[in-house]
């Protein structure tokens, strides 16, 4: 295995030699300032630009680590490899102005060769189909193509078969493969979470980056690990650049480290009112009868908000149903206009003292009980917000009646200031966001809350957030990571005192009075999905250019490129599924990675080799001092060994 690693290492050094003249900074022509790239940004850019035959790369970098700026740097300097390029950038439509257009306009003077395609817009995809032939015919000795795909997991998920049926996006996916692998073209994909749902997405991602080299099946996973891991890894060497300061997933606490805020997870288990529980049970029966029952649609709606006489859709057509929703929202708006809780009641509510205080206004108590009857979630969200010392983000994917529209009335009742970042606020949301992120609002004194839907779940940065509330669960951990990543980004808390550099993540899990919960069901789905996804993530994390370079930093570079052309044409060997039993004496230990001391892990140590195992797979190796003794720290009376990655 390591013979191939060393050859790739020689190619990396070849690229570094070839690009040593490239600057490590990029000039912002609008502000007339220079931005110095981080070492990892500069390194990945030079490898991608410096190796002609490395036609594809995945930037598997955490949220907030500068993927967009790195892509713009590559666009600016790829002419060092060849003078004439067509740049095709695939993005979500909502990310066009910020960050993409703003960043490109700041650093690149001539943008005439850059074309944007929105992969979440039918008309934009039609445009791509129309220009596909002209792009294909223009690729010759005079022109080359660079394809950049932002948040590539969004594009890949649209290409995976659903119920064994081909998706509408599949023909475009095939065209991208053809264009990307045309001689001398390049493709750069970017994502903090490149796989979101299943192994099929991983195969399609690899199919885009290195077509036909592999096809992993779920039966290749044994006890949470890939069999023949090393052989599979060889087909992926150098396929990605990997950057993560904190390895923990979205559901794990982390400490403050290297500019990233501390993260603490809180679960709020709350009980619906009898009326909300009754409607929830109706919704459950409705979901089971419909084709979309697997999406748990009605239960999710009712778990958020259940107006007292709002019944399940039944036989209403869409027009009738939407008209009913408008009427109910108008009724609820009219009802809440007269609610303005007193300061005494709000203080009692914050401190969970409503039942013990005897001097509260009866009107406040009655109004509170009615609001709780409609939504235990919104009530709990208001309590969390009122107890937060600083700014709060609230994720609510539902924009209409059972979501943001009704939630805002609760905020009005409790005198909570807010802005909304959703598909309904396109004209004003960027200005509102700038005001919310303004230095004078670092503690939320002017605007306390930003409510955001999926429109703000990726590519948007929030500053100085202390609490984030998840009102409705996404379907996978990758989306959850993106959502939480809006609040924890590199240096996002630098203007707060050190003791305020934290984010509390609140999951509100609502239960009916007979202990049923769609929130808990989806949370369990997230955990089950992530187990398989972590298997292929481990594969990517074992093969990036950084690990190979660290192993062979001082090896002589090659004279000419050869290896990536060979790897792209070498298909993975058939899997050997036979069981091989090796007996090792292992000892349970607690450890952390040297580059991520915030995440504490459990493992099994082989004292003879200093290798740490997770089940039967080596995952780390002890760091030792000059006397060959393990390096460790003691925190809270726990001995924690310091390690590096095994690969």
Curated annotation (Swiss-Prot):
Main location: virion
Residues annotated as domain Helicase ATP-binding: 48-212
CDD domains noted in UniProt: SF2_C (cd18785)
GO molecular function terms noted in the UniProt entry: ATP binding; DNA binding; ribonucleoside triphosphate phosphatase activity
Gene3D superfamilies: P-loop containing nucleotide triphosphate hydrolases
UniProt keyword annotations, A-Z: ATP-binding, DNA-binding, Hydrolase, Nucleotide-binding, Transcription, Virion
Organism superkingdom: Viruses
Catalytic reaction list: a ribonucleoside 5'-triphosphate + H2O = a ribonucleoside 5'-diphosphate + phosphate + H(+)
Region (Binding to the cap-specific mRNA (nucleoside-2'-O-)-methyltransferase): 467-533
Enzyme Commission number(s) from the entry: 3.6.1.15
Family: Belongs to the helicase family. NPH I subfamily.
Oligomer status and interactors: Monomer. Interacts (via C-terminus) with RAP94 (via N-terminus). Interacts with the cap-specific mRNA (nucleoside-2'-O-)-methyltransferase.
Protein name listed in UniProt: Nucleoside triphosphatase I
Source organism of this protein record: Choristoneura fumiferana entomopoxvirus
Primary gene name: NPH1
